[in-house]
């Protein structure tokens, strides 16, 4: 077992969650020549679960190539992807203010799914959580979008931020909703000798 893992993610929440469970990690971030966002393009007709697993596997392939190209020492690589789904509709990261407002209006008063796939050493686990929101008024949506918090986040929100006040009920993994399901992550790390 190496003394660390590579985290192939730009998410500060994933770093925080790994630190919370005491996993030493080094970042393995995309270079300027990589189009990381292109990996997250939705394929027409793709279901949310298949999308989330495919994107996570693609991120792992890119991270393996990156590690090899940079001549880095061997260590397990952790990749993850979080997807918000309303029915079979994938709500990706908002492209602009109007897109964020559209997503938040769609989620208002609804129960939606948050899927996070995590992959370590070629093994993938999927966490599915159900999140119920109260009805939002136009002012709340406008203020939230103006806060800039929705950007860079699937479904245009961060459960650990201001939108947590709209959450009536969660059935599933809070850490999974944040971006890294700790149960599934530790189950993937145990066979590699990690003890949490």
Annotate each predicted stretch with a short phrase.
Residues 25-34:
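A short beta-strand-loop structural module common to alpha/beta enzyme folds
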Residues 2-23:
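N-terminal beta1-alpha1 ligand-phosphate binding loop
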Residues 2-5, 42-196:
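Anionic-ligand binding patches
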């Amino acid at each position: 077992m190496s003394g660390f893992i590579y985290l192939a993610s730009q998410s500060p929440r994933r770093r925080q969650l790994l630190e919370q469970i005491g996993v030493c990690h080094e970042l393995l971030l995309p270079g300027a020549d990589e189009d990381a966002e292109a990996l997250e393009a939705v394929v027409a007709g793709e279901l949310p679960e298949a999308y989330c697993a495919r994107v996570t596997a693609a991120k792992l392939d890119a991270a393996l190539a990156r590690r090899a190209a940079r001549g880095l020492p061997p260590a397990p690589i952790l990749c993850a992807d979080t997807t918000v789904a309303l029915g079979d509709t994938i709500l990706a990261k908002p492209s602009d203010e109007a897109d964020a407002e559209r997503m938040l209006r769609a989620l208002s008063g609804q129960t939606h799914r948050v899927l996070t796939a995590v992959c370590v050493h070629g093994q993938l686990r999927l966490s599915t959580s159900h999140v119920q929101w109260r009805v939002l008024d136009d002012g709340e949506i406008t203020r939230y979008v103006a806060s800039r918090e929705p950007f860079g986040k699937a479904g245009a929100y961060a459960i650990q931020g201001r939108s947590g006040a709209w959450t009536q009920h969660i059935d599933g993994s809070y850490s999974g909703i944040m971006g890294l399901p700790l149960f599934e992550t530790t189950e993937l790390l145990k066979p590699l000798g990690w003890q949490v």
